[in-house]
């Protein structure tokens, strides 16, 4: 009886020892396999180019479009795009869902629904006074009008550059421009600007400071006027202050998140002739105009090429900002 019990206990102990040995052996084998596998992965990883799924995948759901194997953030997925267009476009299209249609078309170019905003403006005058360029990227469409050519080119100069501006009290003070980057910017429904250059004795040069009729007229009934006079010379100004506001401004540099698209016209606006435009490049393009649908289709087709020459900026531009810091 006791011999049977001892044999049973001995068999059980041997089984436990054998099982323990087998488990330890399996553990050592698995450790060897895992560590060897990880070692091989570490050695070969610099030479392998594996697709990181979830990065730069087409948001359209299509896997046909080739995407660069990169972990860089796709800017369109986190950026906003604003399109500014004249009200006549909305009137001509006359479709309550045209913006939704364009949003779906922008989606095919990588811009998620809700990232593209459409903003209309009545005319250049109202837009220049209150641009409201709030998006990461801003495309301003201006239909060519020969009668507004000066206003269009000056509006382009205004919104394509950053300006530091201060109020001017022309009733009490004389003003001079210090360098080529220093301009006087006037905005309003009708801006007529006259200037009288002064000598060192504050006497008018070719004009009488007491008679504005003898002043030189540099802008007549314009909605937006950027005035440039001889640097380092004091001037007395006459401005139609009841319909116009004038500011003393300094051009700081390009506003790289704004582009101007001229719609139609045989002449192309060009602001690069200004020596203060540095570098001598501009974010402007012209598209042919027949119908506004055609214009928007063209912009959707080329939106990514346009944005590639721009830079995402966080600083916004509105009427209040313009008067003090643009």
From Swiss-Prot:
<feature type="disulfide bond">
    <location>
        <begin position="191"/>
        <end position="244"/>
    </location>
</feature>
<dbReference type="GO" id="GO:0039624">
    <property type="term" value="C:viral outer capsid"/>
</dbReference>
<keyword id="KW-0946">Virion</keyword>
<comment type="function">
    <text>Calcium-binding protein that interacts with rotavirus cell receptors once the initial attachment by VP4 has been achieved. Rotavirus attachment and entry into the host cell probably involves multiple sequential contacts between the outer capsid proteins VP4 and VP7, and the cell receptors. Following entry into the host cell, low intracellular or intravesicular Ca(2+) concentration probably causes the calcium-stabilized VP7 trimers to dissociate from the virion. This step is probably necessary for the membrane-disrupting entry step and the release of VP4, which is locked onto the virion by VP7.</text>
</comment>
<keyword id="KW-0106">Calcium</keyword>
<keyword id="KW-0167">Capsid protein</keyword>
<dbReference type="GO" id="GO:0046872">
    <property type="term" value="F:metal ion binding"/>
</dbReference>
<feature type="binding site">
    <location>
        <position position="206"/>
    </location>
    <ligand>
        <name>Ca(2+) 1</name>
    </ligand>
</feature>
<feature type="binding site">
    <location>
        <position position="95"/>
    </location>
    <ligand>
        <name>Ca(2+) 1</name>
    </ligand>
</feature>
<protein>
    <recommendedName>
        <fullName>Outer capsid glycoprotein VP7</fullName>
    </recommendedName>
</protein>
<keyword id="KW-1015">Disulfide bond</keyword>
<feature type="region of interest" description="CNP motif; interaction with ITGAV/ITGB3">
    <location>
        <begin position="165"/>
        <end position="167"/>
    </location>
</feature>
<feature type="region of interest" description="GPR motif; interaction with ITGAX/ITGB2">
    <location>
        <begin position="253"/>
        <end position="255"/>
    </location>
</feature>
<feature type="binding site">
    <location>
        <position position="214"/>
    </location>
    <ligand>
        <name>Ca(2+) 1</name>
    </ligand>
</feature>
<keyword id="KW-1038">Host endoplasmic reticulum</keyword>
<feature type="binding site">
    <location>
        <position position="229"/>
    </location>
    <ligand>
        <name>Ca(2+) 2</name>
    </ligand>
</feature>
<dbReference type="InterPro" id="IPR042207">
    <property type="entry name" value="VP7_1"/>
</dbReference>
<dbReference type="Pfam" id="PF00434">
    <property type="entry name" value="VP7"/>
</dbReference>
<keyword id="KW-1146">T=13 icosahedral capsid protein</keyword>
<keyword id="KW-0732">Signal</keyword>
<feature type="binding site">
    <location>
        <position position="301"/>
    </location>
    <ligand>
        <name>Ca(2+) 2</name>
    </ligand>
</feature>
<dbReference type="InterPro" id="IPR001963">
    <property type="entry name" value="VP7"/>
</dbReference>
<keyword id="KW-0325">Glycoprotein</keyword>
<feature type="signal peptide">
    <location>
        <begin position="1"/>
        <end position="50"/>
    </location>
</feature>
<keyword id="KW-0479">Metal-binding</keyword>
<dbReference type="GO" id="GO:0044166">
    <property type="term" value="C:host cell endoplasmic reticulum lumen"/>
</dbReference>
<feature type="disulfide bond">
    <location>
        <begin position="165"/>
        <end position="249"/>
    </location>
</feature>
<feature type="binding site">
    <location>
        <position position="216"/>
    </location>
    <ligand>
        <name>Ca(2+) 1</name>
    </ligand>
</feature>
<keyword id="KW-0945">Host-virus interaction</keyword>
<dbReference type="InterPro" id="IPR042210">
    <property type="entry name" value="VP7_2"/>
</dbReference>
<feature type="glycosylation site" description="N-linked (GlcNAc...) asparagine; by host">
    <location>
        <position position="69"/>
    </location>
</feature>
<feature type="binding site">
    <location>
        <position position="177"/>
    </location>
    <ligand>
        <name>Ca(2+) 2</name>
    </ligand>
</feature>
<feature type="binding site">
    <location>
        <position position="231"/>
    </location>
    <ligand>
        <name>Ca(2+) 2</name>
    </ligand>
</feature>
<feature type="disulfide bond">
    <location>
        <begin position="82"/>
        <end position="135"/>
    </location>
</feature>
<feature type="binding site">
    <location>
        <position position="228"/>
    </location>
    <ligand>
        <name>Ca(2+) 2</name>
    </ligand>
</feature>
<dbReference type="GO" id="GO:0039621">
    <property type="term" value="C:T=13 icosahedral viral capsid"/>
</dbReference>
<keyword id="KW-1152">Outer capsid protein</keyword>
<feature type="disulfide bond">
    <location>
        <begin position="196"/>
        <end position="207"/>
    </location>
</feature>
<comment type="similarity">
    <text>Belongs to the rotavirus VP7 family.</text>
</comment>
<comment type="subunit">
    <text>Homotrimer; disulfide-linked. 2 Ca(2+) ions bound at each subunit interface in the trimer hold the trimer together. Interacts with the intermediate capsid protein VP6. Interacts with the outer capsid protein VP5*.</text>
</comment>
């Amino acid at each position: 009886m006791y011999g049977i019990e001892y044999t049973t206990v001995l068999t059980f102990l041997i089984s436990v020892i054998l099982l323990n040995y087998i488990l330890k052996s399996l553990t050592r084998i698995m450790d060897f396999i895992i560590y060897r596998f990880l070692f091989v992965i570490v050695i070969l990883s610099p030479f392998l180019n594996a697709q990181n799924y979830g990065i730069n995948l087409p948001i359209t759901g299509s896997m046909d479009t080739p995407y660069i194997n990169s972990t860089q953030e796709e800017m369109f997925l986190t950026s906003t795009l604003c399109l500014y267009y004249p009200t006549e476009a909305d009137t001509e299209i006359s479709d309550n869902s045209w913006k939704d249609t364009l949003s779906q078309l922008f989606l095919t170019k990588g811009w998620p629904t809700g990232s593209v905003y459409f903003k209309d403006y009545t005319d250049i005058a109202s837009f220049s006074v209150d641009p409201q360029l709030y998006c990461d990227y801003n495309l301003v469409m201006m239909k060519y009008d020969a009668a507004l050519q000066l206003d269009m080119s000056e509006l382009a100069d205004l919104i394509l550059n950053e300006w530091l501006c201060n109020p001017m009290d022309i009733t009490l003070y004389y003003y001079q421009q210090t360098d080529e980057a220093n301009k006087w910017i006037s905005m309003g429904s009708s801006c007529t600007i006259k200037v009288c250059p002064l000598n060192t004795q504050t006497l008018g040069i070719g004009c009488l400071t007491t008679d504005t009729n003898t002043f030189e007229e540099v802008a007549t009934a314009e909605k937006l006027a950027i005035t440039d006079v001889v640097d380092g010379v004091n001037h007395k100004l006459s401005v139609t202050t009841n319909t116009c506001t004038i500011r003393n401004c300094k051009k700081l540099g390009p506003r790289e998140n704004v582009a101007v698209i001229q719609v139609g016209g045989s002449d192309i606006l060009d602001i690069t002739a200004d020596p203060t435009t540095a570098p001598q490049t501009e974010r402007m393009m012209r598209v042919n105009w027949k119908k506004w649908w055609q214009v928007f289709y063209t912009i959707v087709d080329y939106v990514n090429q346009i944005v590639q020459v721009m830079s995402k900026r966080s600083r916004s531009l509105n009427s209040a900002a313009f008067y003090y810091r643009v």
